[in-house]
Amino acid sequence: MSKTVNAYAKINLALFITGKLPNGYHTLETIFAPINWYDRLTFEPSETIEMACTNAELPTDDSNLCIKAAKRLQTESGSQKGVKISLEKNVPFGAGLGGGSSDAAATLNALNELWELSLPSETLHKLATELGADVPYFLEMPALALGTGIGEELTDLQVAFPFSIVTVFPETAISTAWAYQNFKQNFDRLLPDAATEIQIVCETGDLGRMQQFENDFESIVYENYAEVKKLRDDFVEAGSGFTRLSGSGSAVFGVFADDEKATACYEAMRKRYPTSLTPKSFKMK
C-alpha cells in the first residue's frame, strides 16, 4: 500500500520576535497562513528507510527532515517497518515558506497511518516540535493559526482568510540562523493583539488593519538583499493591500482583496520568478 500527499507551504502574516530563551531559541508571536504552493510526497513500503528527491540540491540522507521524522517514529513506536519516500520538490528552500517542515509533518502523518502505529496526537506533537518549530503547524492546523512559544504553541483561529495571496521567491536563499543572529532586537515594545486583529480583518475585509502586523526580519533582510526589497516595492506598485517578507525570507507575498489585481500580479511575477497564487479562504485540509 502506498500513499501520496501534498505538503503545503505557509507564510507569516505577522512575525514578532518577543524574547530569547536560555537554550538559544527565540520566542515569537506569529500568524501562520497556508498557501497554494506544495511538495508532493509518495510513501511506499520498503525494507529500509530511503528517500529520493527531484531536486538534486536537497540532501536525502539523515540530515533530511523527512528521514529524521521517519526514524523518530521508528524509535518512538518500536516499529521495524521501512519506507521509500519520493519527494517532488516544488516549494523553494531558504525562502521562509516552511517547505521542509511541511514535508516532515506529512511524513509523520502518513507513516503513523501506513505503519498502523495509531500514535496519539500528543505524541505526534512532541515529535513534530523536536523536528522543528514550524512542524506542529503543518501537522495540526488547517488554515490561519496563532503561533506562540517558539512557534509550536498553536491556536486555530477558525476563520477563513478572505483575500488572495501572491507569493514570490526571488531565487535568493537566506539562512534562518543568519537572520536570527542579525535582526534588530526590540523585546520591550507593546504588540498588537494579533489573534483578535486578524479575526476582525477576516470578518470586515479591512486590510488596512493589517499594517500593524510586522515581520521583525524585514529591516535586516532589506538592508542586505536589495533584490528582495525591490520585490516588495514591485508588490506595492501592483496594488497589493498588504506586503511582507515571509519568515526570515527570502519569499515576499502580497495580499489582494481584488481577484483581478491578484491574477495580474501573479501573471507578471511568474515571468521573472517562481510564484504561487493562493485563492481566497484557502485551507490545507
Curated annotation (Swiss-Prot):
Residues binding ATP: 92-102
Pathway as given in its UniProt record: Isoprenoid biosynthesis; isopentenyl diphosphate biosynthesis via DXP pathway; isopentenyl diphosphate from 1-deoxy-D-xylulose 5-phosphate: step 3/6
Active site: 10, 134
Keywords per UniProt: ATP-binding, Isoprene biosynthesis, Kinase, Nucleotide-binding, Transferase
Role noted for this protein: Catalyzes the phosphorylation of the position 2 hydroxy group of 4-diphosphocytidyl-2C-methyl-D-erythritol.
Family to which this protein belongs: Belongs to the GHMP kinase family. IspE subfamily.
Protein name according to UniProt: 4-diphosphocytidyl-2-C-methyl-D-erythritol kinase
Species name: Chloroherpeton thalassium (strain ATCC 35110 / GB-78)
Taxonomic lineage of the native organism: Bacteria, Pseudomonadati, Chlorobiota, Chlorobiia, Chlorobiales
Underlying gene: ispE
